[in-house]
Each structure stands twice: as structure tokens, then as C-alpha cells.
């Protein structure tokens, strides 16, 4: 272990196996907090590589509580948070809309990072049980096409790093690990990142983790596909990394200012999301959700973004997506 730590002090990159070994020790609570702070700082200053991120993610997944993984294709749609924009919960809303469009989504989330209301804050306000067992969540995924996995329930070991992270008061590798450690291990993922510099490295990390098809996006300051500007995309398709830029016009929607999709406290967000999921949101709110659903549907093989956007809007207007929220809440 000392050899691994010395490599970091010398600003050398770790192999995936070394990173996995290092984070295994952190997650098991076997590393002194002072040393942990030094390690996280050294990684941050050096800049985390895809090997290091993949190794850390594998360590967290290996130590996570198990989830009965389905053998069908299913996805996660998630952002790192931390983009400081306080927008409405786009990825959480998109998960229900995508499920209503006929694909399966197992969303892994936590309490708010950059918005006042993270995915789990919002779901709680709808009466959805965050403490649902793994078996019940799997059943919901089978029956409804959507399930929510609350991170602390599966990743107890992360608590060992919490005091250090809170004291450091800066972003560390843990801020980007959340979306990579879904315990259901989806084979498709749409992930938003808070910085355009992360788009390629995170996509390379996903390639190493064996995802079938995935896209990493940064939308003009947002950890989502943007409707106020361009979105940088790195997509994994058949083991290849393809990079491109998308504009709102590619989805057939107008451009809207960022202010048009600001969120609020969980209760305010609940009202906004209810409006969107019943087809009564503003044009900007509906478009913001629809473009993210559209790119997710592309990852399931529906290549036409404009048609996908229209499908998502039609599903919102039909009320089907809101019906799934209610059905998930009824499962207690």
C-alpha cells in the first residue's frame, strides 16, 4: 500500500488494480483519515485518470450491498451534480418519461449536491420509499420499467470518507464516482458531468467498465443535455468512443434561457415536476426533459433524436409518466 501512496506523492498515475486496492481500503474504513486526505488531495492535484476512476468505482461496486441484476437492457440517467446551476431535477424526471416511452431505467441517486433538491429529496416528496429493498426495487423495474436505488442503502462504506470530504470542502474523486457505481450495474448510461474537461475521461472510464452503450454529456455549464446552448457528447458505441456536439435544433426544439429551467426547494420542485409529467409544464421545462430522454432513447437504438423528442413530449402530455410516479409511490 505504501508503494501505491508513494506513487501518488510523486504525481504518478496508478493502474486500475492499484486504485482498486487503495479505494478498497478506504471503503472498508481501514485508512487513517489524515492519510486519506493526503491521498484524495494528491489525486485531485494530479488529475484523476480513467484507470484510477475505474479502479475506485470497481472497489465501491465490489463492496456494495448486492442487487439482483436483470438480464435485459436497462439504463441509468444521472448527473454528477455540482454544476451550481440549481435547475429542476431533469434526470429524475427524464427517468420516468423514458420508462413511459418503453425502456427500463434503474436510477441511482442521492440527496442534493448542486440543486436544493437532489433526486432523492424530490422522490421523497412524492411519497416514494427510498428504503425499498433490492428485491422490491428489482420488481418495480420489471413491472413499471423504473426503479430508484438510494445510494446510502447500498454503499455504506462511503461513510468512512465522509468526515474527510466534509473537512476538505473541495471536490474529490468521490464527486464523480456516484454515477459510476449504480449497484444494479446497468449496461446503458447517460451521464452528465459538471465540467467539459470530464466528458472524455469519464467516457474512457465507462469503456473500461464494460458498458454496452453510453454517453457522457456537458451542456454549456450543465450536467445535462442543454436547451440554452451546445452540448458536448462522448458516446460509447460498439466499443468505440465517438465525440460530437449537439444543439437544441438537433432535437427540433427552440433555445431557451437557463433561467427558464431553474428549480427550487423540494416542495416547489414537486409542483413543477408534476406539471411537467402531466404535460402542463412550460415549453422550456418540457423541452429540457424531452431532449435528455431523446438522447437516452438513442442509446437504446432509437437513433432519430427529433422523433424521440416528440415521443417524450407526447408521453408527458398523456400523463403516463406521472402515472408511473404514483405507482412507484404506492409500492411503499
Curated annotation (Swiss-Prot):
It catalyses: N-(5-phospho-beta-D-ribosyl)anthranilate + diphosphate = 5-phospho-alpha-D-ribose 1-diphosphate + anthranilate. Its cofactor is Mg(2+). One of its GO terms (cellular component) is cytosol. One of its GO terms (biological process) is L-tryptophan biosynthetic process. Mg(2+) 1 binds at residues 91, 224. Anthranilate 2 binds at residue 165. Its EC number is 2.4.2.18. It comes from the Bacteria. SUPFAM superfamilies: Nucleoside phosphorylase/phosphoribosyltransferase catalytic domain, Nucleoside phosphorylase/phosphoribosyltransferase N-terminal domain. NCBIfam families: trpD. PANTHER family: ANTHRANILATE PHOSPHORIBOSYLTRANSFERASE. This is Anthranilate phosphoribosyltransferase.
